[in-house]
Each structure stands twice: as C-alpha cells, then as structure tokens.
C-alpha cells in the first residue's frame, strides 16, 4: 500500500531534509516516527529536498507499507512520535504510480523578509531580516524577467548536481505586507539554491544597487559569480507542490504563518 503525507516543519534545527550520517534531518525524524506506527522500517520519498534551515508548510512525501492502518493512525500516531517542530498535516492512500517527486508538476516557494531597522525577536528563525529600505515595485519589475523557460546558471549553486540548468518559472511576485516583504515563486522545478540566489539579487535591486534590467542581463550571462550573494535560509519556505488532479491530493492553506494564499 502506498500512502502520501503532507508535512510541515521548522527547519531551524535540522541539517536539511535529506537523511545524513551523524546530523539531524527532517527525513530521519519522520521515518523513525512512521516506522513505529508501521511496525517495520519506513523510507519516505519527498517532493523537494530543502536545505539546512529552510522550512516547509507544503512538503509532500510518499511511502510504501504492509501495515493496515486507518489514515488517522498515520497522522495522529506520527505526530505523537515526532518532534514538536515537525507535523503531519494530512494522509491519504494513493495509487502505486504516484511518486512524490516524479509525479509533481510544480513547486512553490515563499521567501519572507522582515524589512525593518531592528531585527525581530520572536520570528528570528522564521524570517530573514533586512534593515534598509526595499523598493518592492522595482523588485517586482525585476522578477518578471525570470518568467518562462530559461537557463538559470546565474542563479544556480556551483556544486548543483542537476543535469540541466533549464527551469520554467510560472510566476514570481514580490509584495509588501506592512513590515514584511514576500517573494512568491513557482516553477516546474528548481536548481540548487535557485530561490535564495534569485532573492539575493532581487534585494540588490530593491535597495537601489542595481536596476531591474540587471536581472535580465544576469540571466543572459549564465555566470553565478556575477549575481548577488545567496540570501539566508531562514526566510525560505516550501509552501506547496502541484500534482495532476486525478490523484486528488488535499488542498491546504499554504502560509506560512499569517500569509493568505492570495497575496495580491
């Protein structure tokens, strides 16, 4: 039997999603909890492997099990055995052809910046902080140059293992909500550090160091060394993953925190 789960987590105290030796990972904690419910070792496959410090409100995983349990056992039981910073939001049986990664048609991320002269005290690990003024209109204008199918070498980590730098960005919106600036980006997939590298360069535009057209120029150069520094992990969230409708996966509020689904 194959089961899909929706997962939410605070990535602050983890070395990323992927299981690794001798360090804490979200995957390892989830697999341990599910294995207790299943009474056999469980290995999960995820929609997107997030880096150290990155959060998730819309991560999707699947696993195979021989255990016969009601869906509530996978949600309530797993949550009872998980650390407080990881939670299962939903569970459902899926056909064997469903795959959390390969069946996905798009991933969506949100990067949240606390834009105020003083750093936050409560949400310091859930948002990034920038103290200077940010021109959100110019950031929004700059982001539109990244729409469509492009070679994202300029926004790709040097050690990225993806075979191709080409990705299709479906939307990229930058909006202000009081002291918070949110970068909302959706693509078929992302190369390593793509959202954080784009964010770093959009911040350079927002603070007046570069013009919006610089982003278009960067894209054409296909040179990571010309772009701005990678933005911090703290403000980044994997908020949703799209799948073909026939799988019937639940639709949940994407957040994070106080943010509505529609930011416009």
From Swiss-Prot:
GO terms for molecular function: pseudouridine synthase activity; RNA binding; tRNA pseudouridine(38-40) synthase activity. Its EC number is 5.4.99.12. Transmembrane segments: none annotated. The active site is at residue 51. InterPro entries: PsdUridine_synth_cat_dom_sf, PsdUridine_synth_TruA, PsdUridine_synth_TruA_a/b_dom, PsdUridine_synth_TruA_C, TruA/RsuA/RluB/E/F_N. Substrate binds at residue 109. It catalyses: uridine(38/39/40) in tRNA = pseudouridine(38/39/40) in tRNA. It is an enzyme of class 5 (isomerase). Coiled coil: none annotated. GO terms for biological process: tRNA pseudouridine synthesis. It comes from the Bacteria. The keyword tRNA processing applies. The keyword NAD does not apply. Keywords: Isomerase, tRNA processing. Formation of pseudouridine at positions 38, 39 and 40 in the anticodon stem and loop of transfer RNAs. NCBIfam families: hisT_truA. Homodimer. Belongs to the tRNA pseudouridine synthase TruA family. This is tRNA pseudouridine synthase A. It comes from Vibrio cholerae serotype O1 (strain ATCC 39315 / El Tor Inaba N16961). The lineage of its organism: Bacteria, Pseudomonadati, Pseudomonadota, Gammaproteobacteria, Vibrionales.
């Amino acid at each position: 039997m194959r089961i899909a789960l929706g997962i939410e987590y605070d990535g602050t105290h983890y070395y990323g999603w992927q299981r690794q030796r001798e360090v804490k990972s979200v995957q390892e904690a989830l697999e341990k909890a599910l294995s207790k419910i299943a009474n056999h070792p469980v290995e999960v496959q995820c929609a997107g492997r997030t880096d150290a410090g990155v959060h998730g409100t819309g991560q999707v995983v699947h696993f195979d099990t021989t255990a016969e349990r009601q869906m509530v056992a996978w949600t309530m039981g797993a949550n009872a055995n998980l650390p407080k910073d990881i939670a299962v939001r939903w569970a459902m049986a899926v056909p064997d052809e469903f795959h959390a990664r390969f069946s996905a048609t798009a991933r969506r991320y949100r990067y949240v910046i606390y834009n105020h002269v003083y750093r936050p005290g409560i949400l310091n690990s859930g948002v990034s902080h920038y103290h200077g003024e940010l021109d959100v209109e110019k950031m929004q204008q700059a982001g539109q140059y990244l729409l469509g199918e492009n070679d994202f070498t300029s926004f790709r980590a040097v050690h990225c293992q993806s075979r191709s730098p080409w990705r299709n960005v479906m939307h990229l919106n930058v909006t202000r909500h009081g002291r918070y600036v949110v970068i909302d980006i959706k693509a078929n997939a992302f190369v390593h550090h793509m959202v954080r590298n784009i964010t770093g360069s959009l911040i350079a535009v927002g603070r007046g160091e570069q013009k919006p057209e610089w982003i278009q120029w960067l894209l054409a150069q296909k040179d990571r060394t010309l772009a701005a520094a990678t933005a911090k992990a703290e403000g980044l969230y994997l908020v949703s993953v799209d799948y073909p409708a026939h799988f019937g996966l639940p639709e949940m509020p994407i957040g994070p925190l106080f943010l509505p689904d529609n930011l416009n």
